[in-house]
């Protein structure tokens, strides 16, 4: 069966996002240095902020890259058999990673508060809860599929 256009477009987009994300994560320290040189005169930047923000963004980017890769793994299984326990586990892992990202962003607000940080934290919570909902939906679909396979 031929893969739907939307599925192919999403898979290609995720591969591009993953590649750009890897490049961005690798070059992050240099990008932060350039950013801080430009904005140093405009804002007072606390001592140690550079190390903190690089560590925070590297960890966040790494978690997002894992999430994107797991989404690619799910999309690979769609043409073959989407309703398998492996996809349930992947969706649960994605949900946990999104909640972890939300916690990280809210903890960052204790050190350096920005509206965007709070908005991202809220978005990660909602997306994490949605991933858990999809996980439960897929789990039920797997059970129904296995019951159906046994009756045939």
Regions found by a protein language model. Give the residues of each.
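Alpha-helical transmembrane segments and their helix-start/interface "positive-inside/aromatic belt" motifs
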Residues: 2-19
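Alpha-helical transmembrane segments of multi-pass membrane proteins
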Residues: 19-33, 128
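Membrane-helix boundary elements
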Residues: 27-61
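Hydrophobic alpha-helical transmembrane segments of multi-pass membrane proteins
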Residues: 55-65, 121, 125
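Membrane-helix interface/capping segments
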Residues: 65-85
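Membrane-cytosol interface motif
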Residues: 82-92, 149-152
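Hydrophobic alpha-helical transmembrane segments of integral membrane proteins
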Residues: 89-116
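Alpha-helical transmembrane segments of multi-pass integral membrane proteins
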Residues: 106-152
């Amino acid at each position: 069966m031929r893969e739907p256009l939307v599925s192919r477009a999403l898979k290609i987009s995720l591969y591009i996002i993953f590649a750009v994300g890897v490049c961005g994560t690798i070059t992050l320290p240099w990008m932060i240095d350039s950013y801080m040189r430009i904005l140093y005169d405009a804002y007072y930047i606390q001592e140690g902020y550079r190390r903190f923000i690089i560590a925070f963004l590297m960890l966040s980017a790494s978690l997002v890259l894992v999430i994107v890769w797991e989404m690619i793994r799910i999309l690979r299984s769609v043409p073959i058999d989407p309703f398998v326990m492996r996809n349930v586990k992947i969706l649960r892992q994605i949900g946990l990673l999104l909640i972890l990202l939300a916690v990280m962003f809210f903890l960052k607000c204790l050190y350096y508060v920005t509206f965007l940080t709070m908005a991202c934290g809220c978005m990660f919570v909602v997306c994490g809860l949605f991933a858990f909902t999809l996980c439960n939906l897929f789990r039920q679909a797997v059970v129904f599929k296995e019951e159906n396979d046994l009756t045939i």
